[in-house]
Amino acid sequence: GCSFYETQTQEALDAGHRPVWFLTLGQSGTTDVRMEDCTVRAEYCETIFRMVGDKTRAVVDNCDITMKQPDSMAEHDMKKGANPMLARGNDRADGSTVIQNSRITLSGDNGRRICYQLSALKGNTLDVSLGCGIASTKEVSGNTIRGRIRHKVFQDCSGVENNKVDVRRFSILG
């Protein structure tokens, strides 16, 4: 496996420059990629994985993924966008964008959510502290989700089964 670490210069941060996507796994044309046994660490990007495109097939398997949004980052408004921290998928139910068997730690503000429009999120362990949970994902199964979530854990998801959820509702002070 490989290791991916987000790095930012102080000059870029002072100028307000932050990447939107950390790793793009498919965008245009035909993409078939599998990421296994990797370590991913990020802080300043908006979303770790971009997995969009009609012909994208992207699987993240058995990875250690951490994103902890610094307190100095501007708050997100969940009414003005999906604001996923982990991934934005292609909204297909064919298993083409999947994160599975991974250990995931996410920490963000009240306007952040775990993921949006993935085909599947399955068999993962998620430790979270953020505003929203999993949204518009086709299959959510066999996950252990613990920590703190302000709003719904599952929103507009189908195929939600066999998940162990131990979360507290809270409000992140701004």
Feature names for model-found ranges:
Residues 141:
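Short, ordered coil/turn segments that flank beta-strands lining enzyme active or ligand-binding pockets
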Residues 6, 10-30, 43-55, 62-64, ...:
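Extracellular beta-strand/beta-solenoid scaffold signature
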